[in-house]
Amino acid sequence: MKTETDKIISIPLFGDISCGKFKFMDCDIEGYIEIPKSMIGNGEYFALRASGDSMIDAGINDGDIVIVEKHPSPDNGKIAVIRVEDSVLLKRFYRLEKERKYLLHAENPVYDDIILDECDVIGIAVKVLKDL
């Protein structure tokens, strides 16, 4: 008898997300990935493929699959998927309350922080799947 922890779920894979410079994200579903339900919580999830090297010090490399929970308001310091105009980025997110701005921080010292007046948070990264 299968238990809830044995259950496999499919989540949509939306293609590449920039881990570097701004990049447009193709909104078409590229496919689905199957993961054990026990790997994630109760929420709405999707997956993106990391593109670039700005998050390498957080363990996210070019080509990794990032599992994202839809969440419009992450805590400071969370790795988030952020839409800025027609681009989507994966960065560490900080809300600068005093300045009423947002800071997007890369986890690679060769990239500068990005400071924005406004942005749209799509979700927070919760898992990274890698090929070995």
Q: Where are the model-predicted features located?
A:
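Short, positionally conserved secondary-structure boundary motifs
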Residues: 1-56, 87-88, 95, 99-101, ...
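Hydrophobic beta-strand signal
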Residues: 47, 67-68, 81
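A short glycine-leucine-enriched loop at secondary-structure breakpoints
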Residues: 57-61
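Structural motif
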Residues: 63-64, 78
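Short beta-strand-centered aromatic/proline hotspots
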Residues: 79-81, 90-95
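SH3/SH3-like beta-barrel fold
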Residues: 82, 104-106
